[in-house]
From Swiss-Prot:
Residues annotated as site: Transition state stabilizer: G199, N247
GO cellular component, one term: extracellular region
Annotated site (Increases nucleophilicity of active site Ser): H336
A molecular function GO annotation: acetylxylan esterase activity
Gene source species: Cellvibrio japonicus (strain Ueda107) (Pseudomonas fluorescens subsp. cellulosa)
Name of the molecule in the record: Acetylxylan esterase / glucomannan deacetylase
Signal peptide region: 1-21
Gene expressing this chain: ce2C
Length: 360
């Protein structure tokens, strides 16, 4: 037999062996946190597409074999197995990722998306194990919290050692799972969604950019495009935390913007914010609304959010309140909240929610 024929035969045998090994695994049931597009094409494995921050997946099983399947060269993840130290998975691409040295027995697994990807999406193809493994019960949390906001809610550059960051440094040091939202939710063993995007506001984005968009125009969709409206009958958060206004008011108006005065911007912001909360309330009648804002911009943000709360309460929506936070060091990228700041904000929210009666 010619050498190249032998090489081809061996390659074919190895490929067949690899395919056989892949076919011998089975997908595990999983629990999804965050907005995810679940697709089940004919004769194809289920896929889970995402773009919003802080999405997570969980599974549990009894066995000793675990492989994660990715199709994502955009995001950074952390993998937590049995509450052990997290393992960082950096832009895995299209790959099968085996978990090494897994002992026989019961295991709980959690995969968390860390990074912000405003213009791209990624796909997770699931957790896989060997046929002899036994799936175990998935989390069935009764508590749900939704966080809606901008870069402060995203955790923009929150783990950076410096305020000065390149785009790549910003990407690598943004850890949405260390932002105040997930920290707060985990303290209550609550499922959570982080529906936030850096630079966006209620009616105006940072320095007037992308005037045809706002966080309110992005919010209705499952992904960062208008192809799929988000609907999940099981998502009924008892608490909705909104932090929007920094981008609306942190810069002066430009000549080409549609508001000719600051007062016109204020009125538009308040009217649209009130309308947005009312829409959320119509779908979540029991939800407690917390409108958070900093003391920045000489109190302008706090004043306008206060008007929103007053109008909502005046219209009969009483389960709404304002929290103004101060005292942050803003040592993250580009003067954003640091991981230490995020913990302070989480502590503020945790204490506040612990004092609320009957919200769960």
């Amino acid at each position: 037999m010619k050498p190249h024929a032998l090489i081809g035969l061996l390659a074919g045998m190895l490929l067949s062996s690899s395919l056989y090994a892949a076919d011998s695994t089975k997908p595990l049931p999983l629990h999804i946190g965050g907005r995810v597009l679940v697709e089940s094409p004919a004769n194809q494995p289920v896929s889970y597409t995402y773009s919003w921050p802080a999405v997570y997946f969980e599974t549990a099983f009894k066995g000793q074999s675990l492989t994660l399947k990715f199709d994502d060269d955009q995001n950074i993840f952390r993998l937590i197995v049995d509450d052990k130290a997290p393992v960082v998975i950096n832009k895995p691409g299209k790959v099968d990722y085996p978990v090494e040295s897994l002992a026989p027995g019961k295991h709980r697994v959690r995969l968390e998306k860390l990074t912000e990807t405003q213009s791209t999406s990624g796909r997770f193809l699931g957790f896989y194990t060997d046929p002899s493994a036994k799936p175990l019960a998935l989390p069935k949390r009764k508590r749900q919290i939704e966080f809606i906001g901008d870069s402060f809610t995203v955790g923009y550059g929150n783990t950076s050692p410096s305020r000065e960051c390149t785009d790549e440094e910003l990407f690598k040091t943004t850890n949405s799972q260390m932002a105040f939202g997930p920290l707060t939710a985990k303290a209550f063993d609550a499922d959570y969604q982080i529906n936030a995007s850096s630079g966006f506001g209620i009616v105006r984005n940072y320095n007037g950019t992308s005037p045809d968009k706002s966080l309110l125009s992005l919010y209705p969709y499952t992904l960062n495009n208008p192809d799929q409206l988000y609907h999940n009958k099981h998502w009924k958060p008892q608490v909705i935390v909104i932090g929007l206004g920094t981008n609306d008011f942190s810069t002066a108006l430009n000549d080409n913007e549609r508001w000719k005065t600051r007062e016109a911007l204020h009125a538009d912001y308040v009217a649209n914010y009130v309308k947005f909360v009312k829409q959320l309330h119509s779908n979540n009648a029991r939800a407690q609304f917390i409108l958070m804002n900093s003391d920045q911009s000489n109190g302008e943000i706090a004043e306008q959010v206060g008007k929103v709360v007053a109008q909502l309460k005046g219209g009969g929506l009483h389960q709404v309140e304002q929290i103004v936070f101060k005292g942050l060091d803003y040592s993250g990228c580009h003067w954003h909240p640091s991981a230490n700041d995020d913990q302070l904000l989480a502590n503020l929210l945790i204490t506040h929610l612990q004092q609320k009666k009957g919200i769960w």
